[in-house]
Amino acid sequence: MDSYDYNKYTARDVQNALEHETCSVEDFKALLSPAAEPFLERMAQRAKIETGKHFGNTVYLFTPLYIANYCENYCVYCGFNCYNDIHRKKLTFEEIEHEMKVIADSGIEEILMLTGESRAQSDVEYIGEACRLAKKYFRNIGLEIYPVNSDEYRYLHECGADYVTVFQETYDNVKYETLHLMGHKRVFPYRFEAQERALMGGMRGVGFSALLGLSDFHKDALASALHIYYLQRKYPYAEYSLSCPRLRPIINNDKINPLDVHEKQLCQILCAYRIFLPYVGITVSSREQKHFRDGIVKIAATKVSAGVSTGIGDHESKYTGKDSGESGDEQFEISDGRSVDEVYQALL
């Protein structure tokens, strides 16, 4: 990744990449470069063709369910970090099931369960029981938790989990150390290898992402895609997905903003992903504005979140207007707060 000089690519390199039937790694590097910015419309046209060829008009909806926000890491950009003064909460199993019922009643069939990265507060057995509960209500169950060992992933799969998503945050090792000041998350290689351990543990699919804006987004976008590219060759029958989140403000630090990656650049990255990895699912979360999400699902994205709350135990308030007053604080601010029905109607 360090050797990637994106400024060396020319308009001719980008044109050649778009003319090739199969996108090589070198072509992908050209499509991520500044030289590709004037070709965004052509990239979008090509991406739309690839999406239609492999996914048709299908767009999947899911909702994240945060079940705990205790964390043992000190990540300077995250609202859950252990030094941030927020209201901490861990849902009981009764509360988890109540939240799931509310979500399922909205018509959602896929859920992504998340915790803060604390084994002490959210151990594997706790997460496993939450998966068992989720099986009663949802057809597809994802996890976004702290990285675990392959035998623990196998246990979670047996409990009902179908896929695992892990944010590497940034693939820049030096910057990674400056952003993660304490906790198990400081161990870069263990996190990097999490998706492979999940596949070894029997998970059907794995998701990848860098958090754009933490470091050079050209290089992080390249590394995220290559992470999948090489793992695909080792585990060709697994399902793979990419997310492309940008930094969002957090409680007690509203100066964190995704100013380093603009929407046009984000669109370029997503189109490049689709052209380079035509079979890979692409998720766009509620971190992005509704106009962007409504547009990108017509081009490259295959999955979007709906009815989102990043607080703990906050879905009843979100869906019914009833506020228990006991929810835990959110991880970050969302940009698209539309309900499931509103997102569904926008997709029609």
Question: Regions from the language model: what does each represent?
Answer:
Residues 1-36, 233-348:
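Auxiliary Fe-S-binding modules of radical SAM enzymes
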Residues 22-59:
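An N-cap/entry alpha-helix motif that binds or orients negatively charged groups
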Residues 47, 75, 113, 166, ...:
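Conserved, mostly hydrophobic/aromatic
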Residues 53-95:
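Canonical Radical SAM [4Fe-4S] cluster-binding loop centered on the CxxxCxxC motif
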Residues 63, 100, 127-131, 153, ...:
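Generic structural signal for well-ordered alpha-helices
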Residues 82-97, 103-199, 205-208, 214, ...:
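Core AdoMet radical
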Residues 150-158, 215-229, 289-299:
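Catalytic cores of alpha/beta
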Residues 157-163, 202-204, 278, 298-305:
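Glycine-enriched alpha-helix->loop->beta-strand junction motifs that scaffold or abut catalytic
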